[in-house]
A protein has these predicted regions:
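Charged, low-complexity intrinsically disordered segments
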Residues: 2-191
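Active-site neighborhood of HAD-like aspartate-dependent phosphohydrolases
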Residues: 198-221
Length: 221
């Protein structure tokens, strides 16, 4: 069954408004009102990524902690709540995570590139997630309940919010660029139309038994 992410309560508990108008910030929380809850990694925004079925972003992130590819595939397909229960801390010792059999340093640029690609895939494939993110235009995104130490978590609040705002602003810029292109094309077409010669009405007159264009006849005089 599809989740009603715009509901005001869940399991008898009221969802909270996570937007602060004074600071113009939106706190990303699974128990927040829309769009805060849909932006949570626990939300079931399913997508495919590099051959893997991801039931949620939480599923993808938790799967990175497992070297066994079959276990990784299983966790990757899970919805958020179930995936979070599969969390382990063994990766913290050497800071190595895994993706499809490849070892990756958690603190490396390679890892940052991986999670950026995953979020981009979810953004492109999940209309629900994309719509929720674009509704936050102009807001600063935060995640107050996350762990800030990157050596202890698979994703910090800074990483999460940075990726989401980058996706949002890039998409918004692309939309505006396309709008400007379309306007430019329309204006150019209008200019071309205005430069077209006006069709002249041809009037024929009898010139000694020969029909002649009246305007052409005037030019001969």
């Amino acid at each position: 069954m599809e989740e009603n992410n715009k509901a005001t309560s869940r399991n008898g508990h009221e969802l909270k408004d996570m937007y602060d108008p004074e600071t113009n910030t939106l706190d990303i929380r699974s128990n927040g009102l829309y769009p805060s809850n849909v932006l949570s990694n626990l939300c079931s925004n399913g997508f495919r990524f590099e051959g893997m079925i991801c039931g949620s972003m939480e599923g993808f992130l938790q799967s990175l902690k497992r070297q066994d590819i079959n276990k990784q595939r299983q966790i990757c397909s899970m919805k958020g709540g179930n995936a979070r229960k599969m969390s382990v801390t063994s990766w913290q010792t050497d800071q190595i995570v895994w993706w499809k059999g490849q070892a990756i340093d958690r603190q490396s640029d390679e890892y940052q590139d991986l999670i950026h690609r995953a979020y981009k895939a979810m953004f492109e494939q999940s209309e629900r997630f994309r719509a929720a993110l674009m509704q936050t235009r102009g807001m600063v995104l935060t995640h107050s309940t996350g762990e800030d130490n990157s050596f202890k978590t698979i994703l910090t609040p800074t990483e999460l919010c940075g990726i989401l705002m980058e996706l949002r602003d890039s998409y918004d810029k692309r939309d505006k660029t396309q709008e400007l292109i379309e306007k430019s094309v329309a204006i150019e077409q209008e200019n071309l139309d205005s430069e077209k010669p006006t069709a002249r009405k041809i009037v024929y007159v009898d010139m000694g038994g020969v029909l002649m264009d009246f305007h052409a006849g005037l030019e001969l005089i």
